[in-house]
A protein has these predicted regions:
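Bacterial N-terminal signal peptides
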Residues: 5-15
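PEST-like low-complexity, intrinsically disordered acidic/proline/serine-rich tracts
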Residues: 20-225
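N-terminal secretory signal peptides that target proteins for export/translocation
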Residues: 1-2
Length: 225
């Protein structure tokens, strides 16, 4: 090997190492129990306000049919694990709730064409996603979302989403044992400005389990307002 080729090889290797070091390590098992959830103040359009007020938890909650309606709704579920695995070409997020298995390609977000994830079976509200790293955060961008609800829980139940919805999740470590998930929902059909949600997940020693949702076992529960 010539000195020039060796120098180039060393530079490429050093760049690869530096790039790898820039990737935050958010892998592991995480659970919402003990974490916090914060919804920033939302500003609905007239159409969004009508949809929000028309929500009927007795019949409109997709979870009654074992369907996750948005990534915020999926992250909001307590007492269930999320396992994050970082691979060289993709990231995998396994949600115990509804047994959702999410495999997202890692991409260059500036590229003209991006390879997106496959849709989650029977969950059109979850769209398709791509992921990349930005400083200390894993960023996940989702679009191709069907109309539904950002949340069906607590005072946020019925916050709507349209086909115009674009979701950005930023996963980073608040500390070595606390995962911060910052979610931005951009949906001009329903919101006058982006809806911001922050959820924190403590690290968990539990292992992933099978959820096995069955609509026949669904229980209708009135959201806490």
């Amino acid at each position: 090997m010539t000195r020039g080729v060796l120098a180039v090889a060393c530079l490429i290797g050093a760049a690869a190492i530096a790039h790898a070091q820039q990737r935050p390590d958010v892998s592991g098992n995480w659970m919402l129990n003990g974490g916090k959830t914060t919804f920033a103040e939302w500003h609905l359009t007239d159409a969004g306000d009508r949809r929000f007020k028309a929500y009927d938890y007795k019949k409109d909650d997709p979870a009654l049919k074992c369907i996750g309606t948005s990534w915020t709704r999926v992250w909001l579920n307590p007492n269930v694990l999320v396992k994050v695995t970082q691979n060289p070409t993709d990231v995998r997020l396994q949600y115990e709730w509804m047994d959702i298995d999410r495999r997202i390609p890692l991409v260059d977000p500036t590229a003209a064409r991006l390879k997106r994830s496959l849709p989650i079976p029977n969950m059109p509200g979850l769209g398709t996603s791509v992921a990349w790293y930005d400083g200390d955060a894993l960023v996940i961008e989702t679009r191709d979302i069907e109309p539904g609800y950002v949340s069906t829980m607590q005072e946020w139940a019925g916050l709507p989403q349209s086909r115009m919805m674009r979701t950005i999740e930023r996963l980073s470590l608040a500390n070595p044992n606390l995962l911060s998930i910052q979610i931005t929902h951009v949906d001009p059909a329903n919101y006058r400005d982006p809806l911001q949600v922050t959820i924190t997940y403590p690290r968990s020693k539990f292992e992933l389990m099978h959820y096995g949702c069955d609509p026949k076992d669904a229980q209708i529960t009135e959201p806490n307002k």
